[in-house]
Amino acid sequence: MAITVRPMTLQETALIIEYFHAATPEHLEMLGVDPTRLPLAPQWQRLYEQMFDRPVEQRNGFLVSWLSDDRFLGFSTADKIRIGQQANMHLHITDPSLRKQGIGVECVRKTVELYFQVLELKQLFCEPNAFNVAPNRTLQKAGFTYVKTHMTIPGPLNYHQAVNRWMIDRG
């Protein structure tokens, strides 16, 4: 399976919104997502439109699509971006039948290279829910170094939870 990783288009942001709004309560819990924090779809789409109206270096996020033969496999988002310094990434395989097959490792490796290039990073972090085994294994296999486990709210959709902090440092 040939995997392509590239910056997401504005039209593809609808796939992120659909992914979260269609997810089961169990899946959201595994991700550490509080369903009451999900913006309504039209509001969320407007937020993405506003983001895409700005140059990359002025955005509060950077979105990446994962594809195979033009089929959407999943996505990564970066936030807490400090251009030239650091960012935090998130990772999602959207089709449940494609999970636990090792696809995420290649997607993450290619995404890391894209983030370091476009955002001119020295450090990239990822903080998945400590009890969600899949992304933690994926990050380890993709070359991230485990830093620590701690309690935090990793993003605007999340509740307070235990997360594992992973890092790639090229500073």
Please place each PLM-identified region on the residue numbering.
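Acyl-donor (CoA/ACP) binding surface of acyl/acetyltransferases
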Residues: 1-15, 21-26, 65-171
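A short helix-loop-beta-strand connector motif used in the catalytic cores of GNAT acetyltransferases and
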Residues: 50-64, 74
